[in-house]
Amino acid sequence: MKKLSKRMASLSTKIEDRIYAPLEALSIIKENANAKFDETIEAHIRLGIDPKYTDQQLRTTVALPHGTGQSIRIAVITSGENVSKAKSAGADLFGEEDLVESINKGNMEFDLLIATPDMMPKVAKLGRVLGPRGLMPNPKAGTVTNDIGNAIKEFKAGKLEFRADKAGIVHVRFGKASFTKEALFENLKTLQESIDKNKPSGAKGKYWKSFYVTSTMGPSVQVDINAVQDYQAEG
């Protein structure tokens, strides 16, 4: 059994073994995020799905109203004049077959890969490299598109892709410890709505199994999913 550090053990004693109201949970997470850097705030959500079945898989995108607080490096594989469009739109890496070859050789200095449909036959050959890292472009995720300028703009602004892993768990970063608890909650509410909206057609029984939030170096806190779902913004 992995031994907790003194810091983590101390922080964990401040958390009761119960389900917390959303804003209370976020306040605790912010208080415990006292590392010497701006910790990332993450959600870990267990869903009642079995992703080995195609009709129980979840993979989509969400545009968080306050972004994630993180800058991402975007690579674009495209052709012709779209290469210069990708550059103008702010892509960090861009190219045609040259970029495909570079990635195949191990150049993975990017967080997101966008490709135009005409390049997908070439990108498909990178499955061995991209697949395990979850970087293979996908139309559902908005990363296979002819509108690369808008795609780059949206992802740079905080739109992110997420999916359920093999165990049916969604891991999503949704802000920084420096965010207000209200901004974090608005991001979390948007994430919840996206997960509900994109509920797999084959999902059976209880959809939301558990919902935890945590920071990079802090303990996790369980959140009342019903309170998140029931919240209605004033006005």
From Swiss-Prot:
Molecular-function GO terms, alphabetical: rRNA binding; structural constituent of ribosome; tRNA binding
Source organism, top-level taxon: Bacteria
Gene3D superfamilies: 3.30.190.20, 3.40.50.790
Gene Ontology terms: cellular component: large ribosomal subunit
Keywords annotated in UniProt: Repressor, Ribonucleoprotein, Ribosomal protein, RNA-binding, rRNA-binding, Translation regulation, tRNA-binding
Entry's Gene Ontology BP terms: regulation of translation; translation
CDD domains in the record: Ribosomal_L1
Alphabetized InterPro entries for the sequence: Ribosom_uL1_bac-type, Ribosomal_uL1, Ribosomal_uL1-like, Ribosomal_uL1/biogenesis, Ribosomal_uL1_3-a/b-sand, Ribosomal_uL1_CS
PANTHER family the record matches: 54S RIBOSOMAL PROTEIN L1, MITOCHONDRIAL, LARGE RIBOSOMAL SUBUNIT PROTEIN UL1M
Record-stated family: Belongs to the universal ribosomal protein uL1 family.
Subunit structure: Part of the 50S ribosomal subunit.
NCBIfam families found in the cross-reference section: rplA_bact
Protein name: Large ribosomal subunit protein uL1
